Design a protein with these regions (language model features):
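Transmembrane alpha-helices
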Residues: 13, 65-81, 171-204
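Transmembrane-helix boundary motif in ABC transporter permease subunits
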Residues: 22-25, 70-106, 118
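Amphipathic cytosolic juxtamembrane alpha-helices at the membrane-cytosol interface
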Residues: 54-69, 89, 93-102, 155-156, ...
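Glycine-rich helix-loop "coupling/hinge" segments at transmembrane-helix boundaries
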Residues: 109, 122-123, 200-242
Length: 279
């Protein structure tokens, strides 16, 4: 990895570090008022206080972990389901069941993410599980589409056709002809879904959904403190900047990593043992 690519990993890693280990860093209580509302930064409160007089630094340190956990769980579940359905649909795309599955997935993709979030949150008020479920339902259609097309392209290659003509089992063709080229695409797709899940979780916090107050949440912090922008903008700017840095940083990281990973996958598509079988 070049110095430029290494440097591009710093912002998302720093934000992830703040989100993951922030709650364990010694700081003031993130939920208890410690001073007056919207007090400016000082030696006692490095980022000042928010609308209720709570320490902004403490809430920033405590407010990212829920977003990361929700996004990670949603991405893992959605990616695994998308990988399974996409692989199956790509390898059996001519079958009626595969076509019906893809049509059903397309119908799910037509539902707005915010509508799904609102409906699920209404059924489970104050629950982070509703945010995770909405993220999963939103991510599955896109993952299935992308991975299905990738699998279909791999199945149509000459070496995959030769393996099928030779009588190789579906499991063998999946292992040797599909998975080596599918894994990089699946990882890149999972990264994109992670960013989308973070954004949806932040949106849920902004709308007051999911775990309720006084729990800290970067998205909720932006909404709660918007009225005090002219008095102390830090309670809004800091969490907003962290969300942007995380989304842009992960996107740039995926962009830098995609070239080398996909290149290696393309060169390593057919291993030495497979070349002998094809010949």
């Amino acid at each position: 990895m070049t110095a430029r690519r290494l440097l591009s990993t710093v912002p998302p890693l720093l934000v992830l570090a703040v989100a993951v280990i922030g709650p364990w860093i010694p700081a003031a209580s993130p939920t208890a008022p410690v001073a007056g509302p919207y007090e400016p930064w000082s030696g006692t409160h490095a980022l000042g206080t928010d609308v209720l007089g709570r320490d902004v630094l403490a809430r920033v340190l405590d407010g990212g972990r829920a977003l990361i956990v929700q996004a990670t769980v949603a991405t893992t579940i959605g990616s695994l389901i998308g990988l399974g359905l996409g692989t199956w649909a790509g390898m059996t795309r001519r079958h009626r069941a595969a076509r019906l599955t893809v049509r059903s997935v397309d119908a799910l993709a037509a539902l707005p993410a915010i509508l799904l979030l609102l409906v699920l949150a209404a059924g489970a008020p104050g629950s982070g599980a509703a945010v995770v479920a909405a993220s999963v339902l939103v991510s599955i259609p896109f993952s299935v589409r992308v991975l299905r097309e990738r699998v279909a392209a791999l199945v149509a290659t000459d070496y995959a056709r030769a393996a099928q003509a030779r009588g190789d089992t579906a499991v063998a063709r999946l292992r040797y002809d599909v998975l080596p080229g599918l894994v990089p695409t699946a990882l890149a797709e999972a990264g994109i879904r992670f960013v989308a899940s973070v954004q949806l979780a932040a949106t849920a916090g902004f709308l007051g959904l999911g775990a309720g107050a006084p729990a800290a949440n970067w998205g909720r912090m932006v909404q709660e403190n918007s009225s005090g922008l002219t008095t102390n903008p830090l309670p809004v700017l800091i969490p907003a900047m962290l969300l942007v840095a995380l989304a842009v940083g992960v996107t740039l990281l995926l962009d830098h990593l995609a070239g080398p990973v996909l290149g290696e996958a393309g060169r390593g598509h057919i291993g030495p043992d497979r070349i002998g079988q094809i010949g």
